[in-house]
Amino acid sequence: MITFSFTVARPSVTVKADGALPSGITVLTGQSGSGKSTFIKCIAGLVKPTTGSIQYNETTWVDRGKKIWVPAQKRQVGYMPQGNIVFPHLSVEHNITYSKRGTPDMCNTLLQRLGLEKYRKTKAGSLSGGEQQRVALGRALYSKPTILLLDEPLSALDWNLRKQVREDLVSIIREWDVPCVWVTHDESEVEAVGDRHWICENGLITISE
């Protein structure tokens, strides 16, 4: 389980969070600029908290008081950023295996489960928006992460694609049984995908079951 108690001060917002992340899918909502992305970047190791700590089970990832800092590549976190999420000139296979922290068998499993086997050698930039989302999810899952962090995973899709891709993502996340934080500003996704709903308002994360 991920437990955390930290503050991160940034020019745009100060984020304060204190709690634990259980299994299942946690949907984190809030207005643009409220601190949602900063929160998951702290968990991922992409942003350093100003004060506080983050633990995974018995392992301390961050303790600012004790000057402990485990870098992102050693946390085994799957992170799917918002926006441009594939390397367009690399093949689908190379996109998924980019971190080099998984195995060929894992790549084969993901290609099959994500419906991407026939695109293995295809450049990712030539795929549809929904297919690119699946490639990005495959890359995030490739290292068998202890936690999956998705930042607005459906924002790049038009409304016609969102429902199907959302159902596919949720199905795979539950099948792999990996704790997930799903960041969105779309309130309709709360009931559609989440086991619980957290709210980020002016940098304060409100934890609820």
Placement of each model-derived feature along the sequence:
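Hydrophobic anchor residue at the start of the ABC signature
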Residues: 137
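Catalytic Walker B motif of ABC-type/P-loop ATPase nucleotide-binding domains
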Residues: 148-152
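Conserved H-loop
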Residues: 177-183
